[in-house]
């Protein structure tokens, strides 16, 4: 719909929905510090990459949350909410 109304619309990291996994999923993890330490280790190993955290519901077997936890310092695609437009 946006492409029809606005012409070609280009985004950056969102275009590719396939992300490389850092390690095996942390099924049964109940300690948030484990998750934070894995995020820290991944950021240290890949400082110039987007890092995304994805959370799943084990009972329903669906994704319940997913968001970026690290944006590389070299990224220039961020805009303040007031400066964003479609």
From Swiss-Prot:
Its main location: plastid. Pfam families: RuBisCO_small. One of its GO terms (biological process) is photorespiration. Disulfide bonds: none annotated. It comes from the Eukaryota. SUPFAM superfamilies: RuBisCO, small subunit. One of its GO terms (cellular component) is chloroplast. Keywords: Calvin cycle, Carbon dioxide fixation, Chloroplast, Photorespiration, Photosynthesis, Plastid. It is found in: Plastid, Chloroplast. The basic functional RuBisCO is composed of a large chain homodimer in a 'head-to-tail' conformation. In form I RuBisCO this homodimer is arranged in a barrel-like tetramer with the small subunits forming a tetrameric 'cap' on each end of the 'barrel'. Belongs to the RuBisCO small chain family. Heterohexadecamer of 8 large and 8 small subunits. RuBisCO catalyzes two reactions: the carboxylation of D-ribulose 1,5-bisphosphate, the primary event in carbon dioxide fixation, as well as the oxidative fragmentation of the pentose substrate. Both reactions occur simultaneously and in competition at the same active site. Although the small subunit is not catalytic it is essential for maximal activity. This is Ribulose bisphosphate carboxylase small subunit, chloroplastic 2. It comes from Acetabularia peniculus (Green alga).
């Amino acid at each position: 719909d946006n492409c029809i109304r606005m012409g070609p619309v280009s985004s950056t990291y969102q275009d590719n929905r396939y992300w490389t996994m850092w390690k095996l999923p942390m099924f049964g993890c109940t300690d948030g510090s484990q998750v934070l330490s894995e995020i820290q280790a991944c950021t240290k190993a890949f400082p110039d990459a987007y890092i995304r955290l994805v959370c799943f519901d084990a009972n329903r077997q669906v994704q319940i949350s997913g968001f970026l936890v690290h944006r590389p310092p070299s990224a220039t695609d961020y805009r303040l909410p007031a400066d964003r437009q479609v």
